[in-house]
Amino acid sequence: MITRAELLDMLASNAPQGFEAQALGLVPIVVETSGRGERSYDIYSRLLKERLVFMVGEVNDQTANLVVAQLLFLESENPDKDISLYINSPGGSVSAGMAIYDTMQFIKPDVSTLCMGLAASMGAFLLASGAKGKRFALPNSRVMIHQPLGGARGQASDIEIQAREILYLKERLNQLLAQHTGQDVERIARDTDRDNFMSSEDAKAYGLIDQVLLKRP
């Protein structure tokens, strides 16, 4: 039987996104008993067995690697069964978010998205990128869309290159958001010019989600 200390050491090398290693003691451990004895899971690994993936906290390369790996694993387990992506994120890196986005579109299973708490910036983009008819938000969650942020430094030629890149990303994100919401690109460009916060009902009316969930269906 594995000890709790050994389990925490194992988890520290593969911590769930949004949690630092020092906080692992706060992650619940689930013990399942069967005819073959006991087996311990951290709560996120146990929920992964139910095809639930969590994207919590900043969207960065580490978060993207974890989410992408889980999506690919669940596809290999069953390519015909939906995956649920739970989002509570202030956003973050565009490149990391696009890695998650492209994987969501690439794999065979539909990816259902659900906002709990906050889906802002890239978090909102990924929320809207779920399978059509399977994008949800809880009633008191908030959604925020805006244009990509960037800070250019260096020589004038370097700043010019970075400016062209962020303008390209802005246009590309607007096109994709228009595709997923049904809004025209011009409206998306206007509405993302500054931080644009929405209630879950407003997000539904805008086309970012399909339904506000009061209770589990």
From Swiss-Prot:
It is an enzyme of class 3 (hydrolase). Pfam families: CLP_protease. One of its GO terms (molecular function) is ATP-dependent peptidase activity. It is found in: Cytoplasm. CDD domains: S14_ClpP_2. Gene3D superfamilies: 2-enoyl-CoA Hydratase, Chain A, domain 1. InterPro entries: ClpP (IPR001907), ClpP/crotonase-like_dom_sf (IPR029045), ClpP/TepA (IPR023562), ClpP_His_AS (IPR033135), ClpP_Ser_AS (IPR018215). Its EC number is 3.4.21.92. Keywords: Cytoplasm, Hydrolase, Protease, Serine protease. SUPFAM superfamilies: ClpP/crotonase (SSF52096). It catalyses: Hydrolysis of proteins to small peptides in the presence of ATP and magnesium. alpha-casein is the usual test substrate. In the absence of ATP, only oligopeptides shorter than five residues are hydrolyzed (such as succinyl-Leu-Tyr-|-NHMec, and Leu-Tyr-Leu-|-Tyr-Trp, in which cleavage of the -Tyr-|-Leu- and -Tyr-|-Trp bonds also occurs). One of its GO terms (cellular component) is endopeptidase Clp complex. The active site is at 121 (nucleophile), 146. One of its GO terms (biological process) is protein quality control for misfolded or incompletely synthesized proteins. Belongs to the peptidase S14 family. Fourteen ClpP subunits assemble into 2 heptameric rings which stack back to back to give a disk-like structure with a central cavity, resembling the structure of eukaryotic proteasomes. Cleaves peptides in various proteins in a process that requires ATP hydrolysis. Has a chymotrypsin-like activity. Plays a major role in the degradation of misfolded proteins. This is ATP-dependent Clp protease proteolytic subunit. It comes from Burkholderia lata (strain ATCC 17760 / DSM 23089 / LMG 22485 / NCIMB 9086 / R18194 / 383).
